[in-house]
Amino acid sequence: MKRILTFFLALTMVLSLAACGGKADDNKGKTEVTMTAQEIMDTLKEKLGDSFGCDVAETEDNIGGYWGLDMGQVESWASMSNSNSAVNSSYAVIVKVRDGYAQDAATLLQTGYEQILSYSRMYNMDLQKVLQARLFVNGNYVALLILGAQGDWEASDEVQAKFAAEEAAKVDEVWRGIFGSADNGITIPEEDGSSNNNGGFFDMTDDEGNNDPVLGG
C-alpha cells in the first residue's frame, strides 16, 4: 500500500512539473512591456545611431491630422521625421493605444504610409528605404518605422535594395529586443503606373523641345 501511495505521489509531482514547464514554454518569447511610446523612441534612437535618420519631433496635430489617429484612444505617442523630408523619408510613429484600438491605428498608419510610398515612387526619392518600412503591432503598441542610413543613390537598384534591407534588419533587432518579436505587418501596394518612365523623375522639357524656364529654377 505504501509503495502504491509513494508511486502516485511521485507521479503527481512529475505531472505538476510538466505542467509548469509547459506554461513556461507558452510564455517564452513574450515580453511584458510597460514603456511609454517616447521611451521606445529613445531606445530606437540610441541603439540605431546613424541608422535612425530622424531629427525632428512631430506635433500632436500631426498625429491626429496627417495620420488621422483618435487621440482619445492614444495613451502615449512619439513621432519623428527628417528635417529634409523632401529627399529623406525617415519616419517613426509609435503609439500606445487603449484596448481594442490597435488594429484601427495600424490601418491608419498603413494609409499614411501608402501616401509616403506614392511620393517616393513618383520622384524616385529614398524608395528602397520606404519599401523596407516596418509596421509593428505588439499588444497595444503600434508603430510605423521607415528608418535606416542613407544609401548611395547612384548605385544600382539591387545594391540600394540590399543596403536598405540590411538597415531595416537593424530596426527589427532593436524592436525584437524590446518586445520579443518583430513581425512586420506592412502591405506594399503595387505600382499603379501613374509615374513616368524616366526613372521616376519628371522631364522638364515639352514634346517640342522648348526649354521654357522652370518655376523656381
Predicted regions span which residues?
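C-terminal motif of bacterial Sec signal peptides marking the signal peptidase cleavage site
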Residues: 15-19
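Sec-dependent signal peptide recognition
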Residues: 2-10
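Mature, Sec-exported extracytoplasmic domains of Gram-positive
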Residues: 21-217
